A protein has these predicted regions:
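Repetitive helical segments and hydrophobic/amphipathic motifs
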Residues: 12-16
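Bacterial N-terminal signal peptides that target proteins for export
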Residues: 1-9
């Protein structure tokens, strides 16, 4: 009986030793410390830190940009649009003899502020038709960058400058319907009982900037900006004629307030 008790005690001691050895690694006494390094770019908020993969490759940036625009098409049914155009470096030459000539050409070149609330289902074309149906491609752009900013990713894409943009081709046609081509300017001149023998337009500083959520990659806001420099020769304004008129329209368009279904 005594021998049996001794055997049992010995087994318990041996088992305890095995358990202690097995637990050494868990207590950190024998297992070396491991270091985990993340290669992802981090975007942080004041309360939490989120790991977000910020694309660096141009193709991947454009892909994320297109996905954000598609999000609006699929999930949103309301949004707000603000358009602002200011005219600078206006030179109306001899037409300054007319007291309202400056205001007339600011109007012709599109100066003003416009705010609109859209029901997407009723006004789908305003947003959807402003961009290529198959999405943007890297070859359309001169540059594409992405960076982390608080709880969002800021994607900026830039386009090449162009001369005499039109409604069918070119950089401006890719990003908005809210620009003026020579035909639009010609019509505006007619509305003011005016005309020009030649109209030249140069578009430049063409840029789109999207704020994309780090949570679901939805589009939070979209800003479009560009400049158009107008040079009109042989201008007739009512009874005044023969002057050259030039000016720059600085256009900014903001889409925001997207409401999802």
């Amino acid at each position: 009986m005594k021998n049996n008790i001794i055997r049992i005690v010995s087994l318990i001691i041996a088992l305890a030793a095995v358990v202690q050895l097995a637990s050494c690694g868990k207590n950190g006494e024998t297992e070396p410390e491991k270091t985990v390094t993340s290669e992802r770019t981090k975007a942080s908020t004041s309360s939490t830190e989120k790991i977000v993969e910020i694309p660096e490759d141009k193709d991947e940036i454009v892909k994320m940009f297109n996905a954000a625009l598609d999000f609006v098409d699929v999930y949103c049914y309301k949004y707000k649009k603000h358009v602002k155009c200011s005219v600078s470096d206006l030179n109306i030459g001899s037409l300054s003899a007319a007291s309202n000539a400056g205001d007339a050409f600011r109007n012709i070149f599109g100066e003003g502020n416009f705010d609109t609330d859209y029901d997407y289902n009723k006004s789908k074309d305003d947003f959807d038709s402003s961009f290529p149906k198959s999405g943007f491609t890297p070859d359309m752009l001169t540059d594409a960058t992405a960076s982390a900013e608080s709880d969002r990713i800021i994607i900026t894409v830039r386009f090449p400058s162009e001369s005499n943009p039109d409604k069918e081709n070119g950089s401006l046609r890719l990003i908005t319907n809210d620009f003026k081509d020579s035909e639009t300017v010609k019509k505006s001149l007619t509305d003011f009982n005016s005309s020009a023998s030649s109209i030249s337009i140069n578009a430049y500083d063409i840029e789109m900037k999207a704020a994309v959520s780090t949570v679901d990659r939805s589009l939070l806001s979209l800003d479009i900006s560009f400049k158009e420099r107008y040079t009109l020769s042989g201008v007739k304004l009512v009874e005044l004629e023969g002057s050259t008129v030039s000016g720059i329209s600085n256009v900014s368009i903001n889409y925001s307030g997207f409401v999802t279904q």
